[in-house]
Amino acid sequence: MRIEEDIKLGFKDVLIRPKRSILKSRSQVDLTRLFIFKHAQNKWSGIPLIAANMDTVGTFKMAIALSSFGILTAIHKYYSYLDWKKFIHTIPGTVVKHIMVSTGMLDEDFVKLKQILSLSSKLKYICIDVANGYSEKFVTFLKKVRECYCDKIICAGNVVTGEMVEELILSGADIVKVGIGPGSVCTTRAKTAIGYPQLSAVIECSDAAHGLGGQIISDGGCVVSGDIAKAFGGGADFVMLGGMLAGHKECEGLIFKENKKRYMIFYGMSSKFAMDRHIGGVARYKTPEGKTVKVLFRGAVSETINNILGGLRSTCTYVGAFTLKELTKRTTFIKVSEQENIIFNNQEVSN
């Protein structure tokens, strides 16, 4: 047993200090990024946000909506091959290039992955997604996928420490997904005591990844657009969103009415609800590590995205960053004991 004495930080523990700026308008800020990936050597340009590969968020409809903004969607792994075939043959290539194909690490997952990727050469992203990216089995599977697809951009995770980020990049990952337990419907930290405050994880993991020419995704923990700005300020190359995109018409959660209001079911992918739906229940040796909640139905996702992008542009303006890439260099975090004045938070007038 050992104890690390330094305090690790989450998004709620900091604010970004404003700095002098010569920007005259938020409209001058460019949020697009251009990446050339370490192993695949492919280029990608767009706004580096990603809809999470949760079955209510990472949907085909979400991919179509977000592609118009130049934003990625990690399509969840529960669509069938026939679902994929129908989808790929009915959408333009501009949508396909903003899609990640998600997979687990079972043998049948690999077979299905190969079938899906055979549908279009424009499918460039693979997202190998497991809850615990620290297992040797996961690293072995990553190497197997890289050997088979030398030209694909591979994202792998989840981990939260620099040494494992390095291991995954050296084993074939172009991008490493960072985050254990920060998600809005994740209970891993409560159930297992395992985790790492997200901002510190991003800062440490981005340092490790960038030293090897890789990138990271900050996955989880964002509640407002300011949290996304903090993730980018801390060194994240991409930010993945689940709860912030839940409840929209492009999602596939169950919709119901309660007290004359419309709600949508949203749940973690390790929740009992998800396991009952996809694998026939919770195995006797497991415990659910996610919760099921109701969120207000919010209509089209486009308005939410515009609000997020507006917040990011404003952050950049406050610190004098003309581009999103500059934000990390312009960021100085200050540790705080408060974030905002919440006195009227429950008394807002609906538009």
Swiss-Prot record:
CDD domains attached to this UniProt entry: IMPDH (cd00381)
Top-level taxonomic group: Bacteria
Enzyme class: oxidoreductase
SMART domains (UniProt xref): IMPDH
Binding site for K(+): 181, 183
Record's subunit section: Homotetramer.
Protein's name in the database: GMP reductase
